[in-house]
C-alpha cells in the first residue's frame, strides 16, 4: 500500500519491448503527423458561392467546399490556366486526364491553411500498385501560395525551400 506507481500510459506486455518503447518514446517531440496534411485539408470559402451562386447546385452541400479530384471540371469558371493580372491568386495542383497540372484560383476563395504560406512537399494520395520495389512518383515541392486538390497530400510547413527539398 505504500508504493507509488507511475501511470502505465501505453501497456506493453513484454518487458523488453516495454523498455525499448519507453526509451524511444521519451525522445519523440515532433512527429510526422504534426506536419502532414491529408487530401481533404484544403477547403473553399463561402464567398466563392456568394460571388458565383450558380456553383451551388454542382454537388451536394457536404462536398461543396472540398477541393475534390474533379475540382477543375466542376468549377472551371473560377480556375484559370494562366494567372490573371488582377487580384491575388493561389496555385492549385490537381490532376486531369492529361496528368498533373495546376490552375489559379482567387486567394479569397481558398480557406487559409496551415501550410499555404509555407514550403511543403506534395505527394500523390494514391501511388502505383503497391508492388515491392516499385518506383514512386516524383514528389513536387510546393512553394508558398500553393494548395492542392484531394489528389495529393502535403507534408511540411517549412520556412525555407531547402527544408522541403530535404524532407
Residue ranges and their predicted role:
Residues 1-151, 158-166:
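C-terminal substrate-recognition regions of SAM-dependent nucleic acid methyltransferases
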Amino acid at each position: 500500500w505504500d508504493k507509488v506507481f507511475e501511470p502505465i500510459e501505453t501497456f506493453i506486455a513484454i518487458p523488453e519491448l516495454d523498455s525499448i518503447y519507453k526509451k524511444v518514446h521519451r525522445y519523440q517531440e515532433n512527429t510526422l503527423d504534426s506536419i502532414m496534411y491529408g487530401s481533404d485539408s484544403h477547403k473553399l470559402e463561402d464567398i466563392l458561392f456568394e460571388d458565383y451562386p450558380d456553383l451551388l447546385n454542382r454537388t451536394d452541400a457536404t462536398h461543396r467546399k472540398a477541393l475534390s479530384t474533379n475540382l477543375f471540371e466542376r468549377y472551371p469558371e473560377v480556375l484559370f490556366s494562366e494567372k490573371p493580372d488582377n487580384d491575388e491568386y493561389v496555385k492549385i495542383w490537381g490532376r486531369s486526364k492529361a496528368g498533373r497540372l495546376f490552375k489559379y484560383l482567387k486567394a479569397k476563395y481558398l480557406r487559409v491553411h496551415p501550410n499555404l504560406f509555407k514550403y511543403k512537399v506534395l505527394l500523390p494520395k494514391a501511388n502505383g500498385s503497391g508492388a515491392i520495389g516499385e518506383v514512386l512518383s516524383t514528389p513536387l515541392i510546393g512553394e508558398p501560395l500553393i494548395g492542392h486538390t484531394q489528389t495529393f497530400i502535403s507534408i511540411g510547413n517549412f520556412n525555407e525551400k531547402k527544408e522541403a527539398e530535404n524532407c
